[in-house]
């Protein structure tokens, strides 16, 4: 298997059959080898810099009914909330003061936030903080909507594809949702010049090795600037409430493969990774990740944005989260930096 890992490192690509062999025949030794190699690649491209993104979860209303998600529309137990424009700008103000230069506006697909409202919020943030990057993560929209946000000043867009296999996608989502539509959205985002982020759940219900092969092949074809992966964690108020979580080892191995396949990618060590293991985010960085995303949302709403059970850091103030992550990264020889942390284009 080391031969395949070396090939992925050198050529940044494997065939479907090679990916299948690599994913189906793992050992502790090959996992560790891939993770150490990916950590070297991260250092070669980005040094020991770890980029922070200030996450603002501004609405937990959602029109979708994804079977794995705690803010799905059918969840009658979810305490719904929306931040006002003033709330969002105050989160940015606090974040800016403590060093954040990228803000991520994330929310469910909430019809209250029309294109006009989103455009106005984007414009105000970019007017007040012109040196900052702004990322949106608000789901599937039309090309016209994506263009309007881009023209207003949005720099990046996160839209996890969740699974690239159409049959698996149908098992995780209701019939009105389409994996092909999500892929189409990602291609439109790339075309419009966004730094684009895709990604998948690790260990989601009914996930097979074949599904994972499809994920890696799709990500190679899309060539996104960002990839977000994290372990599936069940939420008590969803149809998947009794399903087992994705594992730490799987997530770390797939992070490593992504770094080897897409050496310049911006790769978060997610909150979900920190939820399944106390040092999950540090281990993610040592497996090739180079982004962390502390929460800037008001503490009063943090516990309401529960996509999965047991989410960490719901009670800490933003400054505490920032300092805690800085200390954690320093202990593993890395430095949390306050610049925009843009994608580094590969030299031809």
Q: Could you tell me what each predicted segment is?
A:
Residues 142-149, 205-218, 275-286:
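Catalytic cores of alpha/beta
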Residues 53-56, 76, 104-115, 167, ...:
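Glycine-rich, proline-tolerant flexible connector loops at the mouths of alpha/beta enzymes
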Residues 113-138, 177-195, 243-265, 317-329:
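Alpha-helix-loop-beta-strand connector modules within alpha/beta enzyme cores
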Residues 73-89, 95-116, 122, 126-186, ...:
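Core AdoMet radical
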Residues 46-87:
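Canonical Radical SAM [4Fe-4S] cluster-binding loop centered on the CxxxCxxC motif
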Residues 1-28, 96, 220, 226-348:
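Auxiliary Fe-S-binding modules of radical SAM enzymes
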Residues 11, 38, 66, 105, ...:
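Conserved, mostly hydrophobic/aromatic
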Residues 56-58, 109-111, 138-142, 163-165, ...:
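Active-site-proximal loop/turn and secondary-structure-junction residues that shape catalytic pockets
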């Amino acid at each position: 298997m080391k031969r395949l890992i070396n090939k992925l490192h050198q050529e940044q690509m494997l065939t479907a059959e090679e990916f299948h062999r690599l994913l189906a025949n793992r050992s502790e030794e090959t996992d560790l080898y891939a993770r150490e190699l990916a950590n070297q690649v991260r250092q070669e491209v980005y040094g020991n810099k770890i980029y922070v993104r200030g996450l603002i979860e501004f609405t937990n209303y959602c029109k979708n009914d994804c079977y794995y998600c705690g803010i799905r529309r059918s969840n009658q137990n979810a305490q719904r909330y929306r931040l006002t424009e003033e709330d969002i700008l105050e989160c940015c103000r606090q974040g800016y003061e403590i060093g954040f230069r990228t803000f991520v506006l994330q929310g469910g697909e909430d019809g209250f936030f029309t294109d006009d409202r989103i455009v106005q919020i984007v414009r105000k943030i970019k007017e007040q903080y012109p040196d900052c990057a702004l990322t949106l993560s608000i789901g599937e929209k039309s090309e016209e909507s994506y263009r309007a946000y881009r023209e207003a000043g949005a720099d990046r867009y996160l839209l996890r594809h969740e699974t690239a296999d159409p049959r698996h996608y149908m098992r995780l989502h209701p019939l009105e949702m389409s994996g092909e539509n999500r892929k189409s959205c990602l291609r439109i985002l790339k075309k419009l010049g966004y730094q684009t982020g895709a990604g998948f759940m690790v260990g989601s219900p009914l996930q097979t090795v074949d599904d994972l092969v499809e994920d890696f092949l799709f990500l190679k074809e899309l060539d996104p600037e960002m990839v977000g992966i994290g372990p599936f964690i069940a939420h008590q108020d969803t149809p998947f409430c009794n399903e087992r979580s994705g594992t730490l080892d799987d997530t770390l191995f797939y992070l490593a493969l992504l770094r080897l396949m897409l050496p310049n990618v911006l790769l978060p060590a997610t909150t979900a990774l920190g939820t399944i293991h106390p040092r999950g985010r540090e281990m993610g960085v040592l497996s090739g990740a180079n982004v962390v995303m502390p929460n800037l949302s008001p503490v009063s709403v943090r516990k309401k944005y529960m996509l999965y059970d047991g989410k960490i850091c719901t009670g800490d103030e933003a400054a505490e989260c920032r300092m805690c992550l800085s200390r954690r990264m320093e202990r593993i020889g890395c430095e949390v930096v306050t610049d925009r942390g843009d994608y580094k284009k590969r030299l031809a």
